[in-house]
């Protein structure tokens, strides 16, 4: 048995480490996490408070952006002056329900890689190139196509759980104030 409240969670020791690590530098900071601090993390609000408090303490936008990728989606949003960017998966979008994968791959592949049953792969890997200078963070994304049957073929909506169902990583420019 696993307590679901302990999944997608930053423990108190890590929260304290983050707080102290941010205080220890006068440089701009970029965070990378698997789980989405803005939506999915059970105590994401506690993490965001640490980031926002550090920006308030120093009086400038020290914490610039937080990247994550767990949701296999693509979006950027601002919360209290900090950008949160969900970087799409390199190879597939997770649907969480059967996706007629038997139409994509032979039985032996589906049997060997059972996660394929609940996902829709891309025809080529996605990636992003991120550059940062004193004025901005620039993300140059990439795109692909869904391998058929596509979400549209499966009569799926454009988003699942509020997360865009896409085969791309968008180009984004985030100004650093």
Predicted regions located by residue number:
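Short, well-ordered beta-strand micro-motif
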Residues: 1, 19, 129-131
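Surface-exposed beta-strand edges and their flanking turn/coil or helix-capping segments
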Residues: 3-6, 14-15, 44, 97-100, ...
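His/acidic metal-ligating clusters that form di-metal
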Residues: 5-85
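Binuclear metal-dependent phosphoesterase catalytic core
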Residues: 74-177
């Amino acid at each position: 048995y696993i307590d679901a409240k302990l999944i997608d969670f930053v423990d108190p020791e890590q929260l304290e480490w983050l707080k102290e690590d941010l205080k220890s530098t006068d440089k701009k900071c970029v965070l990378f996490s698997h789980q989405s601090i803005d939506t999915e993390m059970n105590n994401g609000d506690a993490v965001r408070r640490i980031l926002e408090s550090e920006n308030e303490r120093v009086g400038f936008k020290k914490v610039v952006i937080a990247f994550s990728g767990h949701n296999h989606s693509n979006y950027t949003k601002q919360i209290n002056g900090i950008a949160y960017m969900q970087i799409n998966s390199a190879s597939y979008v997770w649907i969480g329900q059967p996706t007629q994968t038997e139409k994509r791959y032979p039985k032996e592949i589906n049997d060997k890689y059972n996660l394929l049953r609940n996902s829709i792969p891309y025809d080529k890997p996605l990636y992003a190139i991120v550059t940062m200078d004193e004025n901005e963070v620039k993300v140059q994304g990439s795109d692909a196509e869904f391998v058929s049957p596509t979400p549209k073929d499966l009569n799926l909506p454009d988003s699942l759980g509020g997360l865009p169902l896409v085969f791309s990583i968008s180009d984004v420019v985030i100004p650093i104030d």
